[in-house]
Amino acid sequence: MKYIYIKTWGCQMNEYDSSMITVFLEKTGRYLITKEVEKADILILNTCSIREKAQEKVFHQLGRWKKLKNKKPDVIIAVGGCVATQEGKEIFKRANYVDIVFGTQTLHKLAQMIDKVEKNRRFMIDISFPQLEKFNYSLEPKKTGYTASISIMEGCNKYCSFCVVPYTRGHEISRPSDDILLEISILAENGVREINLLGQNVNAYRGRTFNGKICFFSELLRLVSEIDGIDRIRFTTSNPLEFTDDIIEVYQDTPKLVSFLHLPVQSGSNRILQLMKRSYTTEEYEKIIEKLILARSNIQISSDFIVGFPSESEEDFQKTINFIKKINFDMSFSFIYSSRPGTPASEMKDNIDLQEKKKRLYTLQNCINKQTMSWSRKMLKSTQSVLVEGVSKKNIMELYGKTENNRIVTFKGSHKMIGKFIKLKIKKVHTHSLQGELI
C-alpha cells in the first residue's frame, strides 16, 4: 500500500476535482490518502492559474517538495489543475524533478500514469480535453461533511479578455442531468443536507436527459429540490449574460434555493466592461437584480471585482464604487488585475501604478466591508435557520454552522445537533460572522 498526499489550491471546482482524485485512487486498492507530507510516496499538487501570484506559488511549493524527493528519490511528484493545463511541458523545464503533469480533464487517468512512471521512471504528461470522460468514470461520491459541492458542468465559452478559464478548462460541457441527480441522491442518503452546484458558468448548464432531451439549469434546480434529504441548494459561479428569467422564476417557487447569490459583475464602468468583453452593461446587470428582488425580496448579492484593469481611470473606478453602493452588495471577492499570458488583456498597456491599484483595492474593500457589516447588523435579534456543521475551531466549547446567507454562526449546543438544522437567535454580530443562542 502506498500513501498519497494531495495539496489543493484555487476554486471550489479544484476542491471537487481533488475529491474525485481521492476516490479514483483509493478505489484501485493500492493507495491510501495521508495528511502527512513526509509519509507520502506520491505528492499531488492541484493548481490554480487565475492570477500570477497563484501560478508562482506553484513553483515555490514544488521547490519545497524537491527537498523531500532528494531524501526519498522514489517519491513521485504530480502536478494537475489549471497551471498544469496552461504550462504543460514548461513545468518540466522549470522543475525537472516533476514526474507527472495532468490536466483538468484527465485526472481519471492519474492511476495509469503513476503506474507507467513507476515502471519506466520517465515523466508523463496528458493535458488533453477528452470532454466529459472523467465523469464517465465517476464512482460513488465520498461524504466529507453535511454540505457537499458537485460539478455539473465545466469550461466557459465567453472568452472574457482577462480570463484563462477557456484555455485551462476548455469549452462549456454539461454533465447528463441523471448522473448529477444520482450523485446528489447518494450524498443525501449519506447525510448531506446542503448541496452546492459548481461550474465556471453554472447557469449556462445544458445537460442531456436519459431520453436525449435538454435539461436547462432552471429545470435542474427544481429536480434537485425534489431529492429527499437535500434542504438547501446553492450554486456558483454564474454569469449575468445568461441569468435568464426562467432561472429567476425558480426563486419564486423553490424555497430550498437559498436567498444568497454570487453574481460577478467585475466593474461598475461600462467602458471597462466592454474592454473586459463581458457583453453586458451595468444597466442590464441592475435589471437582473431588480427582477431577483421581486422574486425573492430578502435576497442578498455578492460579486467579484477587478481593480486596476488596463486604462481604468479614476472616473471608471468611482463608477464602480457608486455601483457597489447602488446595488448594496453584501460581500465580494476583489482583486488587483493580474495579466495572464495568452489573454487579449495581456496585450493591453498596463498604465496604472501598483500603489494606485493597491489604493483602489483598499477603497473598494472598505466600501464592501461597511455594507457587509450593515447587512450583518440587520440580523441582530433575528431568528436564523442554521445547518450545524461541527465544533468551532476557535472554541471547542462551541458549535458552528451557516445561515442561508452564508454567515458563520457560533453557539453553545449539544454535539447531537451536528448535521441538523436548528433555530438560533442572533445575539452578536461581526462583519463576516455571528454569535447566536438556542431558542
From Swiss-Prot:
It is found in: Cytoplasm. Keywords: 4Fe-4S, Cytoplasm, Iron, Iron-sulfur, Metal-binding, S-adenosyl-L-methionine, Transferase, tRNA processing. Its cofactor is [4Fe-4S] cluster. Coiled coil: none annotated. SMART domains: Elp3. It holds the Pfam family TRAM. [4Fe-4S] cluster 1 binds at residues 11, 48, 82. Its EC number is 2.8.4.3. Residues 142-374 form the Radical SAM core domain. It catalyses: N(6)-dimethylallyladenosine(37) in tRNA + (sulfur carrier)-SH + AH2 + 2 S-adenosyl-L-methionine = 2-methylsulfanyl-N(6)-dimethylallyladenosine(37) in tRNA + (sulfur carrier)-H + 5'-deoxyadenosine + L-methionine + A + S-adenosyl-L-homocysteine + 2 H(+). PANTHER family: CDK5 REGULATORY SUBUNIT-ASSOCIATED PROTEIN 1, MITOCHONDRIAL TRNA METHYLTHIOTRANSFERASE CDK5RAP1. Monomer. This is tRNA-2-methylthio-N(6)-dimethylallyladenosine synthase. It comes from Buchnera aphidicola subsp. Schizaphis graminum (strain Sg). The lineage of its organism: Bacteria, Pseudomonadati, Pseudomonadota, Gammaproteobacteria, Enterobacterales.
